Amino acid sequence: VPAKVVAWNHVGGSGLTVAPGITEVKQLAGQSVAIPFWYSIHNVVVQQLFRDNGLVPVSKAAGSALGANEVNLVVLPPSDMPPALASKRIAGYIVAEPFNALAEELKVGRVQRFTGDVWRNHACCVVFMHEHDLDNRPEWSQKVVNAIVKAQLWTRDHRAEAAQLLSKDGANRYTPHAPQVLNRVLAPAAADREAYLASGAIQHSHWDEQRIDFQPYPFPSYTEELVKRLKDTLIEGDKGFLAGLDPAHTAKDLVDDRFVRNAIASV
């Protein structure tokens, strides 16, 4: 389907959550870690963490023997990850919030590392629109992007209120999550940051990253770097097409920043 990335949604907002007894990435050796999808920023970042700690990502059938330095990657829906961790089916998972915060709240896991502390200001979710709409309904398309940019700006300035609105206690029950879980993500206490600095979940304090933040402009340099990293990432299935992708051309071909530029200028 002809479509374009027209904006970023949020940056950061993900983490590697592990069983309570694990305090180092190296302890994941010989165990299984869940990812939400092979083609995800989560898979890219967790494999970088593995390499940095002398671990080798593999994809093997459940119950297969693993090498001493191997970590088996399994794909799970995000909502299945906390129960799988609690039941010890997996030793950890990497995913978007609030499923890391949920594990903390349920005391079934701890955040080993935030992805935004590994890859600074990385995009997670993006806004992807049909090219037909962009070309044939430009005014409507502009209104969509304007609304998203305004929502991002409002959320940045009203984090606690956003957590309440999005929670199961909010008037519209947008998510099934408790307010305190979403507060951990959107409006964390200052003491939380100190604890993460002490544990090593945050190692680049000078980056001053939020647990989740919002920045709509789709920087080409990020898309180029993502294409480069995907080429060296373990991905199930036929990933041969990645070898032929030129990062700079892909960034230009995949992204249409006309609408987000206008939206940013209007707020």
Where are these regions (language model features)?
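Short, glycine-/small- and polar/acidic-enriched structural segments
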Residues: 1-76, 81-87, 91-101, 108-121
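Residue-level preference for alpha-helix termini and adjacent loops
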Residues: 5, 15, 21, 126, ...
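Electropositive, surface-exposed helix/loop patches at the edges of structured domains
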Residues: 22, 149, 153, 267
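Pocket-lining segment of extracytoplasmic ligand-binding domains
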Residues: 74, 78-186
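Secondary-structure end/capping motifs
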Residues: 135-243
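Aspartic protease catalytic domain
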Residues: 243-244, 248-252
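C-terminal non-catalytic accessory extensions
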Residues: 253-267
